[in-house]
Amino acid sequence: MTDNNSSNLVPVNIEDEMKVSYLDYAMSVIVSRAIPDVRDGLKPVHRRIIYSMHEAGNHANRAYRKSARIVGDVMGKYHPHGDSAIYDSLVRMAQDFSLRLPLVDGQGNFGSLDGDAAAAMRYTESRMAKVAHKLIEDIDKETVSFNPNYDGSEEEPSVLPSMFPNLLVNGSGGIAVGMATNIPPHNLGEVIDACCLYVDNNDIEILDLLEVVKGPDFPTSGIILGVNGIKSAYLTGRGSIAIRGRAEIENLGNGRQAIIITEIPYMVNKARLVEKIAEMVKEKRIEGISDLRDESNKNGIRIYIELKKDIVAEVVLNQIYSCTQLQTSFGVIMLALKDGLPKVMNLKEVIAAFVSFREVVITNRTIYLLNKARDKAHILLGLTIAVSNIDEIIRIIKAASDPNAAKQELMARSWDALNILPLVKLVDDKAMLNEEGKCSFTEAQAKAILEMRLQRLTAMEKNKLEEDLKNLATEITEYLNILGSRERLLEILKEELIKVKEEFATPRLTSIEFGEFDQDIEDLIQREEMVVTVTLGGYIKRVPLSSYRAQKRGGKGRSGLSMRDEDITTQVFVGSTHTPMLFFSNIGQVYSLKLYKLPLSNPQGKGRPMVNILPLKGDEHITNIMPLPENQDEWDNLNIMFATAKGNIRRSDLLDFKKIQSNGKIAIRLDEDDKLIDVKPCKEDEHILLATKSGKALRFPVESLRVIKSRTSDGVRGMRLAEDDSVISMTVLKGIKATREERDAYLSVSWEKRLEIAKGEEFNSEELGVDLTAESILEMANSEEFILTVTENGFGKRSSAYGYRITDRGGSGIINMDINDKTGLVVGVMPVKMDDELMLITNSGKLIRCKLETVRITGRNTSGVTLFRLDDGEKVVSASLIAESSDDNEEDSEFEEEVAEEGSE
């Protein structure tokens, strides 16, 4: 065991040591591993692979070589790391779905879009791609500096003399210590055009560069959404670019469609994408898909998604975009090494760095070629003098004892150069002329003379020497012109860029869609008719309308809701999943919600408590729900009419309720013993019909009420009520232009005939026996509305709205229905159309749909007919209308035999 001498120990501060060591490690990772150089766009491992393949002669016009051999050369000479890291880098450079211009030409399995790994390196073969030669061209002309390799046995280039901006064309990605880079690939032609614009004008604005560089061009194609992310990335070096796969909608006939995905976003695993879609379907986050399969082959991507009948393909596609990587974002961080240090650069800075580097490369190459041309001209001048003085040259050589003596003698003599002075000046070789204006051979020239073949003494060879000298003089002049003129140098730079563009540029693969693409959540919601049911216990649910079946009047119905704890349904209406709704509570608060946010259930389900959906406080509960038009432009001319059980009404502007915070807002002030019965949108030219449970009704114009701006007002008296009576419904009707006499005359015509006239059948006004013109009869028939009244014992009737005369608000009303013990109290009054259907719900949860065309039209003062056959103790608690759907027609015949046509009139 060694005895440590205290004199050999140097105490250090551990914080300082960690700081220095960590920074050294961080810079090593940044400079030597993870971050590309802005000049050639390569990390050290990629640069070493290309240089090693070049040195080994593994060129594009040569045979493929085993990848294992290439990896071995790189690891042994330049990159002392694991072979898997080198091979992974080699594989990526060969993948046409990773690089816009692959730098390696691979043969064998080099992976796939499904995330399949490449075959082992012993099985695959590689060689340089043709475009890779443009990265390394002129490397043998002293264009870039070389550094010793890891053990000093070899030299490797610090950068490749790239002839095109590879950093932008192929992009790069990497994670270093404390920083990361993520540069997207671009179109070669666009990037070179931008470089040429910068060469022409170094002060060009970045936005002007964006005119030619439209945006990233990913090898997997796809669609870029909007330009804001592109502008941010190019202006600041950072940004987020939304990418979407390309999909087409194919009609299969019979109401069915299919979605065909032909392109996916960059770096998205196709197999994982298909799995994710399947997962979302299983979790019911994506609905409407009946079949999913991957039909991709060597010809391209094809993901086939077949939809169920009558499903809107655009909605399903939006759901796929939202829930999977078919739409993703590419976070741009244009970080690269500039002058050996990491820097986030904008588009102009990257292009400027590349152009500046190419200037250096072309300058170094020109200096190298100039020196080579001068060296060759120097030798040719010596040979020319020797040929002109061949006899003396031969004599000196013959007299010399050995080659060295001959060389020294040739160098010691001065030669007359009058006949070649123009050539000497032409090639600018001042080293040959002495003070006397004669020429002396240099050692290189003397050696070349001694090695000259006798055939050079012929007249033809003599002329060829002079011709070669003149050509070299032209080259030297051009090189000097390049070095002396930056304009000429930049001209060459542009010419070489354009040549690369002409040889390797391809059309843009990724398209760009302009506009804003902040996707509304409603774009993901399938438009579907829903039945919304609300219970006395505060439960709410939505059920697809297609879940219910049409029955005939008098049928027994089906179980629509499983009741617990004597909970009964208090409200039911039909709307679209996109229908906006206002929720009014017992304390006069209003909340806003879209229908699709309600819990989806089945006819037997109870739903969810509204207290779990809305931020209700304490004993607050929802008493009324008002569906609104989907198009908010229709709200401008609408008011809201409030009606309370005590007969109070209030007219407010609907726009006052357009913006409601999530915690709601005050809608109306209520007395303690009053409650909100109904809230409906209305227009100024319409009428309001208030109906009570005892069979009374009052009709008055909306315009007779002023708009009350105060949301805390309880309104004005709408109807005077008897002691035990209360308002149970409010109906909005069309305004009546006809006089009372005209209405009475019109109502004397049978309702069957009136319906025929409304349907467009011809009629003779004189045969009708009324004192009305044909035009008046036709106008009234087209404008006629019918009021449906339903009682708790299942009775109902339809009456013409013309039978309800207009009175002032505040009155006690007229008879709406003849109420008795058999009919029970009124539970619902509403306007109906001939093709409407009625949905009734009882306190036991039984539900039935009834076509209203089977309900007789009678006068106001009648008891109606049986709509619903009730069991003992059963009462109707809710009634709502359903617009006719195509599904009903298909089901009528199926259930016609099941349901007996019963009920008394």
Curated annotation (Swiss-Prot):
Keyword Ligase annotated: no
Enzyme class, broadest EC rank: isomerase
BP GO annotations: DNA topological change; DNA-templated DNA replication
UniProt domain Topo IIA-type catalytic: residue ranges: 35-524
Cell compartment(s), UniProt: Cytoplasm
One GO cellular component term: DNA topoisomerase type II (double strand cut, ATP-hydrolyzing) complex
Active-site residues annotated for this sequence: 123
Enzyme Commission identifier(s): 5.6.2.2
Ranges of compositional bias, category Acidic residues: 885-905
Record field: catalytic activity: ATP-dependent breakage, passage and rejoining of double-stranded DNA
Keywords of this entry: ATP-binding, Cytoplasm, DNA-binding, Isomerase, Nucleotide-binding, Topoisomerase
Any further remark recorded for this protein: Few gyrases are as efficient as E.coli at forming negative supercoils. Not all organisms have 2 type II topoisomerases; in organisms with a single type II topoisomerase this enzyme also has to decatenate newly replicated chromosomes.
Record function comment: A type II topoisomerase that negatively supercoils closed circular double-stranded (ds) DNA in an ATP-dependent manner to modulate DNA topology and maintain chromosomes in an underwound state. Negative supercoiling favors strand separation, and DNA replication, transcription, recombination and repair, all of which involve strand separation. Also able to catalyze the interconversion of other topological isomers of dsDNA rings, including catenanes and knotted rings. Type II topoisomerases break and join 2 DNA strands simultaneously in an ATP-dependent manner.
Family: Belongs to the type II topoisomerase GyrA/ParC subunit family.
Protein name per Swiss-Prot or TrEMBL: DNA gyrase subunit A
UniProt organism field: Rickettsia bellii (strain RML369-C)
